[in-house]
């Protein structure tokens, strides 16, 4: 009996081990294939997104570079107008448009293509209202800058430039929405081409006028407005003139329904991105209010601009991740989701604490009491960023992903039912 019982398990265990090895090898091959497929999908969105962000971000950099040929005051004024005033509204509107990234991605994944055009128009309405509410920042830029302690000459000139940058501010309404509308459908190559065209046109315009004509900061602002609208026009024509036949069916009154739900979805993201965007710009205001010279302000603006170039790369991957998650959620593939947990409000709180409780106060202390000057402000900024990164990493590690995936899928189902009911009525 013992010999019989010993022989049989040996044969069975050998067979079972062989099967387990085969299964393990199959799972490994499947994992590699799925990973490679997902990497290609991510890069399909991330590549053009990174190039587009770098191109559009470079428009302001080019403007500042050519403004540097004028004088220190002009450069300081246009630096404050572009890196502080417009960047505040940039963060708010970019955050509001992020709701479209989620909705369009989910609708595309669920093959509800007709809803993408509705969401796009709904986004235009909400962002247009938001942009109008933000106009006082441009109109009253001079007194606002004076209240923050900026030199009077710089504040006056920066206020003038800010007024002339209102057209660029309004272009954000359509630019951000169109980009997310196209990204949600994986139509990303056109975004890169149009952004590259706007960059080339802007560079040529600045070179031409700098070489053959003497233009001031107002002329530089006008060229910046024009280049942003070139990008908007290119994307708009592609979207409505046949590039998106499945998702664009013309203008619809459905765009005016569900506006409050759209606003609620975008509010937390708007605050989150605005806090992060304004953080780097508030250092410029602090530098001016603490008695630093125009040259110091220029140097800090250039550092922040250079940092902005670098951060466009992870922002591109962020956009790609958001699109892929939304596509999988819309298709009902909750198992493929490891993001999109609706943490915008929590991240906004983390940003508020790490940036404005740690970063800015520490920078001021190092600048004022330790005599580090601009280096102190920069060190404070980096410290706030480190605190933010560590805090978010801890939150991510402790996340219960299975629970978050189920909750995310539940939200998709509710949203789909709500949208379908709206269309039926």
Walk through the language-model features, giving the residues of each.
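Interfacial segments at transmembrane-helix termini and the short loops linking adjacent helices
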Residues: 33, 145-165, 259, 290-298, ...
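Small-residue-rich hydrophobic transmembrane alpha-helices
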Residues: 61-64, 75-135, 139, 175-184, ...
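Interhelical loop/hinge segments that connect adjacent transmembrane helices in multipass membrane
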Residues: 2-46, 190, 213-217, 221-227, ...
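Interfacial/gating helices of multi-pass transporter permease domains
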Residues: 42-45, 66-86, 110, 114-115, ...
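Helix-loop interface residues and adjacent transmembrane-helix termini in multi-pass membrane transporters
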Residues: 61, 69-72, 107-110, 184-185, ...
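Alpha-helical transmembrane segments of multi-pass membrane proteins
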Residues: 88-89, 136-140, 152-178, 193-194, ...
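Membrane-interface helix-loop junctions in multi-pass transport and translocation proteins
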Residues: 32-39, 188-233, 237, 295, ...
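Residue-level signal for short hydrophobic patches within transmembrane helices
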Residues: 39-58, 62-63, 84, 88, ...
């Amino acid at each position: 009996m013992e010999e019989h019982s010993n022989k049989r398990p040996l044969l069975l265990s050998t067979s079972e081990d062989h099967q387990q090895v085969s299964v393990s090898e199959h799972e490994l091959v499947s994992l590699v294939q799925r990973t490679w497929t997902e990497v290609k999908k991510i890069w399909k969105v991330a590549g053009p997104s990174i190039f587009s962000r770098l191109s559009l971000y470079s428009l302001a950099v080019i403007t500042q570079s050519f403004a540097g040929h004028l004088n220190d005051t002009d450069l300081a004024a246009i630096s404050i107008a572009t890196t502080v005033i417009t960047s505040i509204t940039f963060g708010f509107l970019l955050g509001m448009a992020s709701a479209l990234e989620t909705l369009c991605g989910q609708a595309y994944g669920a093959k509800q293509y007709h809803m993408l055009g509705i969401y796009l128009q709904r986004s235009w309405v909400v962002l247009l209202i938001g942009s109008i509410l933000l106009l006082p920042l441009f109109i009253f830029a001079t007194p606002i800058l004076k209240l923050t302690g900026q030199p009077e000459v710089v504040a006056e000139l920066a206020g003038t430039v800010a007024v002339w940058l209102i057209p660029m501010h309004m272009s954000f309404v359509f630019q951000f929405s169109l980009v997310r509308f196209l990204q949600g459908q994986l139509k990303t190559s056109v975004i890169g081409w149009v952004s590259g065209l706007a960059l080339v046109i802007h560079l040529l315009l600045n070179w031409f006028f700098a070489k053959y004509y003497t233009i001031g900061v107002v002329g530089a602002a006008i060229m910046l407005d024009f280049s942003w609208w070139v990008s908007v026009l290119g994307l708009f024509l592609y979207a409505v003139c046949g590039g998106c036949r499945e998702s664009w069916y013309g203008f619809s009154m459905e765009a005016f329904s569900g506006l409050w739900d759209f606003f609620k979805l975008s509010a937390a993201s708007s605050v989150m991105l605005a806090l992060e965007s304004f953080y780097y710009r508030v250092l410029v205001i602090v530098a001016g209010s603490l008695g630093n010279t125009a040259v110091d302000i220029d140097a800090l603006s250039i550092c922040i601009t250079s940092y902005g170039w670098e951060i466009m790369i992870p922002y591109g991957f962020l956009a790609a991740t958001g699109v892929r998650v939304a596509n999988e959620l819309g298709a009902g593939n909750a198992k493929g989701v490891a993001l999109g947990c609706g943490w915008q409000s929590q991240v906004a709180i983390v940003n508020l604490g790490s940036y404005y409780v740690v970063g800015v106060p520490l920078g001021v202390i190092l600048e004022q009491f330790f005599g580090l000057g601009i280096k102190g402000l920069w060190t404070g900024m980096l410290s706030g960023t480190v605190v933010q990164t560590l805090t978010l990493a801890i939150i991510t590690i402790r996340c219960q992903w299975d629970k978050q995936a189920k909750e995310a899928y539940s939200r998709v189902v509710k949203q789909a039912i709500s949208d379908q009911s709206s269309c039926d009525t």
